[in-house]
Design a protein with these regions (language model features):
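PLP-dependent class I/II
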Residues: 1-170
Length: 170
């Protein structure tokens, strides 16, 4: 990707690295900014604490990149949302400065649960699924004759007691 982007100087890269710490055992995260230093002036990295530290809903994140763009983004953000509450800021600070043992433990647990889910979905003849990596959710492909995803989720809940969220929510 970096080789192609070098030929297109008008293109910027926005690298969403929210799943940086939720890796399979033995895998290593590679930040786009680190592997493509020639594109550093056109690369912006978005990250946060929602996934890696289970702080979903606390709305603590960060953006790194070229100073002028970051300043403009900060000005825009400051006029469109309120500040992050103090307990979430303290939680984020503790996450940055503390041990990552809990993150490793959570990643193992998420991966285990995802594997159970994937195995169960693979056992349903009508569904096809690509085994997900780097995340804790799955997106099975429904047959063409199936109802749309939202209706499918309603049927799953009503008929078999399975609560699932349709992919369109994401």
């Amino acid at each position: 990707i970096a080789e192609i982007l070098c030929r297109h100087p008008q293109v910027f890269v926005m690298s969403d690295e929210i799943y940086e710490f939720l890796l399979e055992e033995g895998e290593i995260h590679h930040s786009f900014a680190a592997i493509a230093p020639d594109l550093a002036d056109r690369t912006f990295t978005v990250n946060g604490f929602a996934k890696g530290w289970a702080m979903t809903g606390w709305r603590v994140g960060y953006l790194s990149g070229k100073r002028e763009i970051i300043q403009a983004a900060s000005a825009l953000q400051s006029h469109s949302t309120s500040n992050v509450c103090s307990f979430a800021q303290r939680g984020a600070l503790a996450a940055l400065n503390g041990s990552r043992d809990c993150v490793i433990s959570m990643a193992k647990s998420y991966n285990h649960r995802r594997n159970i889910l994937t195995k169960g979905l693979q056992g349903i003849e009508a569904l096809s699924i690509v085994e997900p990596t780097g995340a804790f959710y799955a997106f099975p492909r429904l047959p063409q004759t199936s109802p749309k995803s939202l209706k499918f989720c309603e049927i799953a809940l009503d008929q078999v007691g399975l609560a699932i969220v349709p992919g369109l929510a994401f």
